Regions:
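Structural signal for conserved beta-strand scaffold positions within catalytic alpha/beta enzyme cores
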Residues: 8, 34, 70-72
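Short, charged, amphipathic alpha-helix that recurs within catalytic cores of restriction-modification
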Residues: 38-70
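Beta-rich catalytic cores
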Residues: 18
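Flexible, glycine-rich phosphate/dinucleotide-binding loops
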Residues: 15, 31, 41, 77-78
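Acidic-basic catalytic patches of nuclease active cores, encompassing PD-(D/E)XK
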Residues: 1-13, 25, 62
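Domain-level recognition of nuclease-like catalytic cores that cleave nucleotide substrates
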Residues: 62-104
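Conserved catalytic cores of phosphodiester-cleaving nucleases, focusing on short active-site segments
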Residues: 22-24, 28-39
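Residue-level detector of flexible, active-site-proximal loop/helix-junction positions
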Residues: 13, 39, 87
Length: 104
């Protein structure tokens, strides 16, 4: 992850805990990822799941940069979208990533 220290959180079932699928740190930056692997052309992330990313990020006060990112793994393509607030989101296979680790 481009100099990031990262951890995959192995939670296979829906959990009441605000745990992301993956999180990574680099310096004063913390990034939390919710990842989907849809069979269709779109990945849906309901508001409740996105809200958990922000709850997780808020646990860590020392980090001045906190980012919530939705990831979708389509056949032969990944799309990453940074989100600013909890809401319902759809990530399409056709869109370009709005988040890139290289810019960190």
């Amino acid at each position: 992850m481009n100099g990031f220290k990262a951890v995959r959180v192995p939670v296979s079932a829906l959990s009441g805990e605000p745990l992301p699928d993956v999180f990574g740190t680099k310096g004063d930056c913390l990034v939390a990822f919710e990842v989907k692997a849809p069979k269709a052309e779109r990945a849906y992330s309901p508001r409740e799941q996105v809200e958990k990313l922000f709850l997780f990020l808020n646990f860590f006060e020392p980090f001045s940069q906190k980012k919530a990112v939705l990831g979708a793994k389509f056949p032969r393509k990944w799309v990453f979208r940074m989100v600013e607030k909890p809401d319902d989101f759809v990530v399409s296979r056709e869109e370009q990533s709005s988040y890139h680790l290289e810019t960190q």
